[in-house]
Amino acid sequence: MIDKNAILLERKKKIDAKMDKIKHKIVVMSGKGGVGKTTTAINLAYGLSVKGYKVGVLDADLHGPNVPIMFGVEGKKLSKVSEPLKISDNLCISSLSFFIPDDNPVIWKGPQKITAIMELLEGIEWKELDFLIVDLPPGTGDETLAIAQNINGANALIVSTPQNVSILDSKRALKFAKLINLNVLGMIENMSGFDEKFKKNLEKSLSVLVKTAEKLY
């Protein structure tokens, strides 16, 4: 009889060993879709790479894996999970979209999503990285929980927009991150048009540092 718990424990040990070799792990998350989360993740990764850091990007948005599209490698297929796609000397990426047909939707339940995330984390050979940037799906679902449980020492960066509904969802994402013991680096207010007073009020409301997107570089 197969001991599933033993298999999961062994897989977790392998993931921990790989993650411990990576100096900085940042998960980019949002309370809702359409706020520029993926754009933020890839720009953060690219910005770090041109400064000389070794950076990997993991596309953990299983239902909408758009990282390859935004790096201009849409339709690219890989034969091995272990080999991330090299974008530049300092930047490589991995995504579920490298291993499934482009027009096939992912119709998976929670356990299947968690298994897929763990297989990616276990299988990818990042080699030496200064930063691993993880692009999470919007919301606070299974993928986010699986990443938090399997990437020790991960830091969270929350992306929002100035609309009230986005800010409310960001509050939920912030609470979720704290509940699952993610260290929150701060929040990026994308597509920003609010004044300094509003930013200060938002920081006070969320108890987290808020940066407008135009001030990232």
Positions of PLM-derived features:
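Conserved catalytic-core segment of NTP-binding enzymes
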Residues: 8, 131, 137-217
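Residue-level signature of catalytic and energy-coupling elements of molecular machines
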Residues: 22, 33, 59, 67, ...
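Walker A/P-loop phosphate-binding motif and the immediately C-terminal alpha-helix
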Residues: 25-62, 174
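Short glycine/serine/threonine-rich phosphate/pyrophosphate-binding segments
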Residues: 35-43, 64-68, 139-144, 166-169
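Phosphate-binding loop that captures ATP/GTP phosphates
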Residues: 54-56, 60-107, 114, 122
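Loop/turn-to-beta-strand initiation segments
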Residues: 90-92, 128-132, 155
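Phosphate-binding/switch loop-helix module in NTP-utilizing enzymes
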Residues: 100-150
